[in-house]
Structures are given as structure tokens and as C-alpha cells.
Amino acid sequence: IIESFIDGDEYSIDGIISKNNPIILSVCKKYSLGKSENFIMSGFTSVKQSSSSKDEVFFERIENATAKALEALKISDSLFSLDIIASRNEVNVVECGILLDCKIDRLLSFMGINIYEMMISVISGQSISSPKVDNSSPISLNFLFANKSGYFQINQDAVDQFKGQVFWEQTPGSLVSKPKSISDILGWTISVEESKPQKELYFLNESV
């Protein structure tokens, strides 16, 4: 196994390809909990393309890398997802497959894109086009993790005040602890990036 260290930011590129025509639906910067938590993925934020020449070059490189990866793997009439590391001068494809990245379908739905309707159109031989969406504000999907051991309880008042969507993987009363992998999420939120919860959305009690 040959490994190489690449300095840059990690992105998830997700979309659909029909008749060898790839349509990129989302470009999201990926975040992690850091070294102390084994770099477990903590969420995504969609990247908006501006009119700057820097952004034009960045997105052009992403489009070229996506097309080359899909062609090399002979992926067509399918969903696709790429993990890339982007530095100042290049885009490196780390992984490419036919499944969307974790919960990206929910993020696309929040953006107004029904990815499953698009996929049905593809497999039934209908033509599809890139949907028009409002990209004026970045969309964030954040995974919720326990920072200690305890019994999980939902802070319903905070959930009701949150300007976004909240989904739970755990049920109230479940014993949870600090994460060892992405499968240990308590739940996740989707919102416009500026909309942060004003209060914790959950409690961890010492007893049920």
C-alpha cells in the first residue's frame, strides 16, 4: 500500500449521470471532529459558486475531475459521489462510487431537489436537466454526537425554535456515549448555514 499526504480541503461531489452526461447537484465541503475523535465526519456545507475567476477555475477543475472519474469507471445512468481533496492548484479524487454521500439526499431535498424522481426518469429512459435551485445561502448538514456518556433526552423547546430540520437516530432514554464512528450519531440537522440552534437540541442525563 502506497500512501501520500495531500494538504487541502475535503469535498463531496454528488450528482446523477444520464446518457454519459454528468449533472453535479451539490458541491459540499466536508468537516470532521478532528484527530481526537479519529476524524469522524461531522457534516457538510454546500459551496456556492460566485462569479470570481478563482471560483470559476475551482468548479471547472471539479467538473473535469468528475467527468474523468466517471468515464474511467464506466459509470452511466446512475447516481454518483466523489470525495476529493482540493488544494490551491489541483483537485485529487480520493474515492468515487454510485451511492450518494451520507445523508446527501436529505440535503438535496432541503434544497428543493428530488433526487429519486430524477433517478426514476433516468432508468425509464427520460431526459433530465440540471434543476434550478436557490443557491443564495449555503446549506449545512450537521451530525449530532454525544460529548459524554448519559441517557439521551430531546430538548423539544429548542427543536421547536430551530429554523431548520432535525432528525433523530436515537430514542429518548437511550444510553449513549462519545462516538467511535459515524454510526454513533444522535441525529442530524439541516439548515441555512446562518441558522444555528440557540440552545442545545438534546440533554444527556445521568439517569433515565
Name every feature range the model reports, one short phrase each:
Residues 4-11, 15-68, 72-74, 79, ...:
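ATP-dependent carboxylate/phosphate-activation module, predominantly the ATP-grasp catalytic core
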Residues 11, 25, 94, 140, ...:
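A broad, low-specificity signal marking well-ordered, structured residues that form hydrophobic/aromatic
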Residues 79-81, 139:
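Extracellular structured ligand-interaction cores
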Residues 89-92:
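Conserved protein kinase catalytic/activation segment
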Residues 120-208:
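Peripheral (often C-terminal) accessory segments that flank ATP-dependent C-N-forming ligase machineries
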